Curated annotation (Swiss-Prot):
Transit peptide residues according to the UniProt entry: 1-37
Lineage summary: Eukaryota, Metazoa, Chordata, Craniata, Vertebrata
Gene Ontology CC terms: mitochondrial matrix; mitochondrion; plasma membrane; succinate-CoA ligase complex; succinate-CoA ligase complex (GDP-forming)
Descriptive protein name: Succinate--CoA ligase [GDP-forming] subunit beta, mitochondrial
NCBIfam families documented for this protein: PRK00696.1, sucCoAbeta
Organism: Homo sapiens
Subunit structure: Heterodimer of an alpha and a beta subunit. The beta subunit determines specificity for GTP.
């Protein structure tokens, strides 16, 4: 069962990939580590694949209506699909503030592409995954619309349980793969790949067969699988997910849609890819937090959470929820903390007008609790904190940290454990 906050804010949390996803494959679990701090638009992912020999539909990118019209003419396709380029899902059912309904349109007339693009580019598209005001569309993708005779699912990912890459596939594609894993686990297939030997032809062929490809299509699918794996390694991806990985009536195996997740630690050798990172759709506070190596996600509540570690942050949000409160954010401090980071974190939290209380929950393993305490007292004084502050510290130098807080003369409420902290934070808001 999903945790309360995970159910409430799952789509937001997926943007930062702060939790692993799991697929039951037979009796074993396959871990999908979706760490998406780097955000790429659909056309960027498809270009990466195309440049590396993976077959995708022909497409052009346009940032004006005239460019979209010319692109549609150049495609010379039987049917054209026009797709607004934003990072949020649900584009097909979205609504523009221009009045246009839908961020994905099919047409056979290039002139219609130009007319539709004029109502997309420069306007906000609102979907279930965007803020109410929507997200501004700066580019559209003009692509050849291909018929799909059969859809399958394919992913290559880093699986911590086997310390290496795993190929995961299902003959049922185009749907939520977690639902397939839950209802028909026998339709989930996997191949564990030796990172040193690479993917074997026998593995690619076997996966192609398990996905239901036969005859010449089987060899074609195996070739695409191998190329996807080579791309996965080349770009330091943590996951390449293709859904659907399909075939056309003309007998071609095509990657129709893909999500690529990257390892942030590889930025130093993947500069070209990380230069494509699109932060324009982030909340300004998220971009500001990133400057100080803080991971921030805004939520709808009024109790700010200041925590180290994604798992602890999730637990903190959940326990606030279970005690009748609502978290205002998800702020992960991480390790290697400096006082300046603590100060900046408080500056971000207090800038949110929704925040009526702050809960600090730190478990000091790598993190030195004394540094946290010094940062807290400095922030409280310099920012003239006006909302209740509840602090729970545990771990490295916690006694010294408690002395710093107790001797500060500041109105800081200490908590003995997470349950106590959550109750006190919720109670402080209820008093208002």
């Amino acid at each position: 069962m999903a945790s309360p906050v995970a159910a409430q804010a799952g789509k937001l949390l997926r943007a930062l990939a702060l939790r692993p996803r799991f697929l039951a494959a037979g009796s074993q679990a396959v871990q999908l580590t979706s760490r998406r701090w780097l955000n790429l638009q659909e056309y960027q992912s498809k270009k990466l694949m195309s440049d590396n020999g993976v077959r995708v539909q022909r497409f052009f990118v346009a940032d004006t209506a005239n460019e979209a019209l010319e692109a549609a003419k150049r495609l010379n396709a039987k049917e054209i699909v026009l797709k607004a380029q934003i990072l949020a899902g649900g584009r097909g059912k979205g609504v523009f503030n221009s009045g246009l309904k839908g961020g994905v349109h099919l047409t056979k007339d290039p002139n219609v592409v130009g007319q539709l693009a004029k109502q997309m580019i420069g306007y906000n598209l609102a979907t279930k995954q965007t803020p109410k005001e929507g997200v501004k569309v700066n580019k559209v993708m003009v692509a050849e619309a291909l018929d799909i005779s059969r859809e399958t699912y394919l992913a290559i990912l880093m699986d911590r349980s086997c310390n290496g890459p795993v190929l995961v596939g299902s003959p049922q594609g185009g749907v939520d793969i977690e639902e397939v894993a839950a209802s028909n686990p026998e339709l989930i297939f996997k191949e564990q790949i030796d990172i040193f030997e690479g993917i074997k032809d026998s593995q690619a062929q076997r996966m192609a067969e398990n996905l239901g490809f036969v005859g010449p299509l089987k060899s074609q699918a195996a070739d695409q699988i191998t190329k996807l794996y080579n791309l996965f390694l080349k770009i330091d991806a943590t996951q390449v997910e293709v859904n659907p990985f399909g075939e056309t009536p003309e007998g071609q195996v095509v990657c129709f849609d893909a999500k690529i997740n990257f390892d942030d630690n590889a930025e130093f050798r993947q500069k070209d890819i990380f230069a494509m990172d699109d932060k324009s759709e982030n909340e300004p506070i998220e971009n500001e937090a990133a400057k100080y190596d803080l991971k921030y996600i805004g939520l709808d509540g009024n109790i700010a959470c200041f925590v180290n570690g994604a798992g602890l942050a999730m637990a903190t949000c959940d326990i606030i929820f279970l005690n009748g409160g609502k978290p205002a954010n998800f702020l992960d401090l991480g390790g290697g903390v400096k006082e300046a980071q603590v100060y900046q974190a408080f500056k971000l939290l207090t800038a949110d007008p929704k925040v009526e209380a702050i809960l600090v929950n730190i478990f000091g393993g790598i993190v030195n609790c004394a540094i946290i305490a010094n940062g807290i007292t400095k922030a409280c004084r310099e920012l003239e904190l006006k909302v209740p502050l509840v602090v729970r510290l545990e771990g490295t130098n916690v006694q010294e940290a408690q002395k710093i807080l107790n001797n500060s003369g500041l109105p800081i409420t200490s908590a003995i454990d997470l349950e106590d902290a959550a109750k006190k934070a919720v109670a402080s808001v209820a008093k208002k």
